[in-house]
């Protein structure tokens, strides 16, 4: 069984394309590969939001992906004419626009701020609807108590702390969960009306653990709220946490770190994709895998290698 350490990815899959071609030949009748998409921010590499969505669509089609997941903050506009041109370009390129990755934060004692984020999320659902996208990634939000330190940004410090941050003084985690649950519940009617599944990601804040994610999903108990499963965002108890989320997953965001991870904490993580693939087969997952490349290697070489790796690992039985 392969185990993939982020820090060694730069060399672990030399010749991966050839190996994956051989494995493709061995896939038996009665099985099918999961469709593989790619997040547009895999091309951005945290160097700014200037990488155009149009370029990402062109490269994704060139590399042979089945779909593309759009990062909303990377889009230059939310005007309908821009959205429809993006949809048309993806269609002609042979790509599904299979996901929209959004940002919001419901973790605030300020009711007006929570309402602002509820309204924002409803708007994001409508953007997805205009693009024909079936699911959006949503977050709980964070406490916002992490501060820049020693020349490091707030997010760099958060990553050094593996996503853990203190609760706002005078409040409890239970307060935070109530805010998040009440806020997401108000977005469900819009999601149902537009036919867009909300995928709550294990992504810092109250979604740092599988238990936190499932507390929210179970409490709301709606078919329009599922899980966006990120393979790289669990630092501890990885297997148990992945297993807890797997049955509720509507989209997998699959991290790779060729060339080593930008944030050192992720170099400590071993992502065993064949094992994750087996877990998802046990749960009859037939949906999209969306590549999120977060390594230091140039995207032009790392993204195609990542596609080979994911093609090799994710498939399912037809019967």
Feature-to-residue mapping (PLM):
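Glycine-rich, proline-tolerant flexible connector loops at the mouths of alpha/beta enzymes
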Residues: 69-91, 143-148
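Short strand->helix junction
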Residues: 75-76, 107, 234, 296
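Conserved beta-strand positions in the central sheet of alpha/beta enzyme cores
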Residues: 69, 99-101, 137, 199, ...
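Active-site acidic/histidine proton-transfer and metal-coordination neighborhood
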Residues: 5, 10-12, 25-30, 89-92, ...
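Residues that line or immediately flank small-molecule/substrate-binding pockets and catalytic motifs
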Residues: 72, 104, 140, 256, ...
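Metal-dependent catalytic neighborhoods of phosphoester/phosphodiester hydrolases
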Residues: 78-86, 111-116, 299-302
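A short gly/proline-enriched turn/hairpin at secondary-structure junctions
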Residues: 72-75, 201-203, 294
């Amino acid at each position: 069984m392969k185990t993939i350490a982020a820090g060694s990815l730069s060399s672990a899959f030399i010749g991966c394309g050839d190996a994956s071609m051989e494995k493709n030949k061995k896939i038996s009748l009665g099985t099918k590969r999961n469709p593989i998409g790619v997040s547009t921010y895999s091309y951005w590499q945290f160097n700014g939001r200037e990488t155009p969505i149009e370029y990402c669509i062109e490269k994704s089609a060139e590399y042979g992906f089945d779909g593309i997941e759009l990062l909303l903050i990377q889009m230059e506009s939310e005007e309908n004419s821009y959205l429809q041109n993006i949809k048309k370009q993806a269609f002609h390129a042979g790509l599904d626009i299979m996901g929209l990755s959004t940002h919001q934060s419901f973790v605030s004692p300020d009711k007006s701020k929570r309402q602002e984020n509820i309204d924002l999320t409803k708007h994001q659902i409508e953007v997805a609807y205009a693009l024909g996208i079936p699911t959006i990634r949503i977050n709980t939000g964070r406490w916002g108590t992490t501060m820049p330190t020693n020349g490091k940004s707030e997010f760099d410090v958060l990553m050094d702390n593996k996503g853990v941050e203190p609760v706002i003084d005078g409040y409890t985690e239970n307060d935070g969960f109530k805010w998040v649950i009440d806020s997401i519940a108000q977005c469900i009617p819009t999601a149902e009306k537009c036919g867009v599944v909300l995928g709550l990601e294990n992504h810092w804040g109250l979604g740092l653990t599988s238990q936190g994610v499932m507390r929210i999903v179970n409490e709301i108990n709606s078919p329009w709220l599922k899980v966006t499963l990120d393979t790289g965002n669990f630092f501890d108890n990885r297997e148990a946490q992945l297993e807890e989320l797997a049955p509720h997953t509507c989209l997998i965001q699959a991290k790779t770190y060729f060339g080593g991870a930008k944030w050192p904490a992720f170099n400590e993580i071993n992502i065993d994709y064949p094992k994750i693939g087996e877990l998802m087969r046990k749960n009859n997952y037939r949906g999209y895998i969306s590549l999120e490349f977060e390594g230091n290697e140039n995207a032009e070489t790392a993204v195609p290698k990542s596609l080979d790796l994911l093609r090799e690992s994710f498939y399912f039985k037809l019967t």
